Amino acid sequence: MQQWIEPYAGFELTSTLLSVEASYQAEKLTALGIDPDYYRGWVDPAFFIGISIQAGIDSGISAEGNVNMLTRLKVLRAPKLDEPMRVKGKIESVTEVPRGLRISTNVTFETTTGETLISVPRESLKPMAKASDSPTAGRGAGSRPPPVIQSTSDLEIREDRELRPEQTLGYSREGNAIHYDEAVAQQAGFRAPIIGGGQGVHYLTRAFWKLGGQSDWEIYFRRPIFWDDHIQVGCLANHEGLALCRGEKVLTEVAVRS
């Protein structure tokens, strides 16, 4: 049985070499209904959200039940498919909040010569098993940045996406069963499994990322997206804000810094 390490500030992730293989990207994007040929040999940056979480799992930090709240996806130099990269990372802080532990992690991906390609700082919530386990009273996961999108009526809708459970099952990997196990998701308080944050961001990178370009996105996961939701992909007229929405509700939003 896996012996997990309780997260603590200063914990360094195991440094490993990896690459995003063309066959892997094709398999996962096809599962989501995205044509992998669109990327023309570039890695879809949305993959680095899941890969950075997996780096923690591989280092002994459980992701089971954790909720991704904020991810910054900064592409300094876009990697190509099958390009070798070294992953490094560190837990910067662990803070007690009413709902559990708020964990700040920074993961970077470098070339074999040390050039930083992508950095992925992340804020996640590790919920307590039950309310009485929480180290602080009340509810909440700590401070929340102000919204990027004031109203979904401000968005220019680019496309509609009808999500299907088989898409999430085909995309997800083991590590956090709330994404693929109905019983676990319901036990966590969700009516159905919720998609991982990275899955939703694939719809945004497909619509708005300039192939091979630098970018700096601050991604806020505001509300859960269920694996059978109907969502819309949109942006502000100035392209400084992107979003996945459902009706009048913003589900995931992005502050585009560059």
Enumerate the language-model features and the residues they cover:
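HotDog/MaoC-like acyl-thioester-processing domains
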Residues: 2-7, 70-160, 224-227, 232-258
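A conserved acidic, glycine/proline-rich C-terminal tail/linker
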Residues: 204-233
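Hot-dog-fold acyl-thioester-processing enzymes
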Residues: 1-70, 136-142, 146-212
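Small beta-barrel nucleic-acid-binding modules, principally OB-folds
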Residues: 63-78, 213-222
